[in-house]
Regions:
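Primarily recognizes the serine-hydrolase "nucleophile elbow" in alpha/beta-hydrolase
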Residues: 1-50, 62-63, 67
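Stable alpha-helical elements in mature extracytoplasmic
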Residues: 5, 9, 68, 72, ...
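Sec-exported extracytoplasmic/periplasmic mature domains
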Residues: 14-19, 77-81, 167-171
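Conserved Rossmann-like nucleotide-binding pocket used by diverse enzymes
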Residues: 33, 56, 84
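Active-site pre-Tyr helix/loop in NAD(P)-dependent dehydrogenases
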Residues: 35-38, 59, 91-94
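Short beta-strand/loop motif that positions the catalytic acidic residue
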Residues: 55-57, 61
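Short alpha-helix in the alpha/beta-hydrolase fold that links the catalytic acid
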Residues: 65-75, 100
């Protein structure tokens, strides 16, 4: 389970290629649960995943917009993977935080790659697909200015969904 950039890690940890590289223990992860993940990076063999994968995302999220996650989830579904994207209307980035106000709050200094297309052209090497150069946080596609807001209704729905998933994968009933 991970949130925002941690959600990106939770999502891409499902890739078998990364599991082979980094999982020396041999322990398998029961489920991958990314919250409002950034799905912009196209990795080599990124359709070869284990699962289940359950993503939770707000539709108006302008930090990590939902469209790339929709596209990635559709690609995974077409290849027969166990993946679901739960979308919440009127739900912004970090919707699960009780310290955020309910009304969208601007974070003008926060960086986002919402306008970037990032691809892995060889193992471990990410490029800005527009320029063909190695991706950096100084690239022109990197912007500042996002919004966050709590959504207690989406939080409760997500808690229920995660509980149901974990009950199933750990056979708790």
């Amino acid at each position: 389970m991970g949130f925002s950039r941690g959600g990106q890690i939770a999502l891409y940890a499902s890739m078998r290629r990364f599991q082979k590289l980094w999982n020396e223990s041999g322990i398998e992860i029961a489920a991958y649960i990314p919250f409002y993940a950034q799905c912009y990076a196209g990795y080599i063999d990124d359709s070869d995943v284990s699962g289940p994968i359950r993503l939770f995302h707000g539709v108006p999220d302008d930090y990590n917009p939902i469209a790339p996650c929709r596209n990635y989830v559709e690609r995974l579904r077409q290849s027969g993977k166990d993946v679901q994207l739960t979308e919440y209307a009127d739900t912004w980035h970090v919707f699960d935080s009780p310290t955020n106000p309910i009304t969208p709050t601007a974070l003008p200094a926060a960086q986002t790659v919402r306008n970037c297309v990032i691809k892995e052209d060889r193992p471990g090497h990410l490029i800005n697909a527009t320029s063909g150069e190695p991706f950096t946080w100084q690239d022109a596609c990197v912007e500042r200015g996002v919004h966050v807001a709590a959504n207690p209704i989406a939080l409760k729905a997500t808690q229920d969904a995660v509980k149901a998933l974990l009950t199933t994968v750990f056979k708790l009933e």
